[in-house]
């Protein structure tokens, strides 16, 4: 008897097609909102940033950033959240001892709670940037709510520590954003900043593990995602700074990095092998 080939009725073929359409739509939504991949809540109060985030810069007008050619390797250390009354002063002292400027993406409500610490960050020559007012997942908010978080967060920081440079940098909490998020930031005059390396200090990692990760994943130019409430991060900084300097890097703020790097360099950083 010849083999029988099952030919599904028309309604089954239609259902299969519709299922495929739904699956494709779900996948597209995940990529569009940057929510596909590991983004679960780790132990503690921190939330995991997106695993494969890269510096994404929302345009002002028709440009992302200036296109001046870079001179040498540059690295920007960025610290999210806070400020915090115990660890942030230790972090500021360490950065002062190392003569390293950094960019702090502060939460507006936390800055209001600790205004003296916020002013100390600015007085130390560091760049203060917007990390929203209350640290929500922006990809779950309406366009109006996103704009409000950016506007109110920036206003809180400006009241406490006015920025003479008037540069407006913004990082979405947990790295979660949609196209609408970027448009809202652009409309408000913000450059949206992610990172080239996330060593995972939002988890309970040791200083040695953090150091090893940063050194193994070096690129140029470099934007490193760190957090201002982690003692392991503070402990890892002296050796990290020393190794990068020996490899020819200059430590700058994100604002300085944007002024000296092209959009192509920022979104496609070159891998660098650091010497021992």
Please annotate each region the language model reported:
Residues 44-167, 259:
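Active-site beta->alpha N-cap acidic-glycine motif
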Residues 118-121, 144-146, 207-210, 265-270:
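Short low-complexity, flexible loop/linker segments enriched in glycine and/or proline
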Residues 82, 107-109, 133, 173-175, ...:
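Active-site beta-loop-alpha junctions enriched in small/polar residues
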Residues 1-77, 84-98, 239-243, 247-276:
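N-terminal pre-catalytic segment of deacetylase/amide-hydrolase enzymes
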Residues 56, 87, 136-162, 166, ...:
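Alpha-helical scaffold elements lining the catalytic groove of polysaccharide deacetylases
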